[in-house]
């Protein structure tokens, strides 16, 4: 699949899903969050272990068509941070975002970098949970995955989403700034011919 073949799903589909989830009963949302306690969150695993799990679980997505076939769709165009680098193109699996569960083998988002030849290169994964849901189910305990703490994105934000916790894992392209930082200094949106955020 090339960059031009990628269709950005309308942002309202993600926002609509968020609003539907917010209207769900608080009890069922809390139950979904608290019933999915993994040893992943309890263990203080070395960073390499999380990277290995992410690589093993996303290897098939080097072909973006397989990611699309499994429910991932492009949201937000290509996310650029100017001097700090970029986050690339986020292919979001909305049902995984809305289930409120964190599993290192099932990332909510897979991330691609647009290449000059028009192809997309898998560079990482992103785990995301909405802050209100997480904080309600786990008061005073920010999310972590295999010992890696998530970052909080407050609202309002550039994505138009409610506050959320996120953890980028640059498993397929080494990041000189760190494996789990939000921005990748070596990623660019220059080859993307759509909307750059």
Predicted features along the sequence, with ranges:
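N-terminal secretory signal peptides that target proteins for export/translocation
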Residues: 1-9
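Low-complexity, intrinsically disordered regions enriched in charged/polar residues
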Residues: 8-9, 13-14, 44, 48
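Bacterial N-terminal signal peptides
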Residues: 13-23
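Sec/Tat signal peptide C-region and signal peptidase I cleavage site
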Residues: 25-29
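Primary mode marks residue(s) on the alpha4-beta5-alpha5 output face of response regulator receiver
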Residues: 30-197
């Amino acid at each position: 699949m090339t960059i031009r073949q990628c269709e950005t799903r309308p942002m309202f589909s993600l926002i609509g899903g968020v609003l539907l989830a917010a209207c769900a009963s608080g009890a069922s949302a809390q139950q979904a969050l608290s019933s999915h306690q993994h040893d992943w969150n309890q263990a203080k695993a070395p960073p390499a272990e999380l990277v290995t799990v992410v690589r093993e679980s996303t290897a098939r997505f080097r072909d973006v068509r397989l990611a699309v076939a499994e429910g991932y769709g492009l949201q937000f165009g290509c996310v650029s941070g100017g001097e700090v680098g970029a986050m690339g193109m986020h292919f979001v699996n909305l049902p995984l975002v809305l289930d409120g569960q964190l599993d290192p083998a099932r990332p909510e988002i897979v991330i691609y970098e647009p290449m000059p030849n028009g192809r997309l290169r898998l560079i990482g994964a992103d785990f995301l949970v909405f802050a209100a849901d997480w904080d309600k189910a786990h008061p005073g305990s920010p999310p972590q995955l295999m010992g890696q703490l998530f970052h909080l994105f407050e609202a309002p934000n550039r994505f138009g989403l409610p506050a959320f916790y996120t953890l980028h894992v640059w498993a397929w392209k080494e990041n000189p700034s760190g494996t789990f930082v939000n921005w990748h200094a070596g990623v660019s949106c220059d080859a993307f011919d759509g909307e750059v955020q």
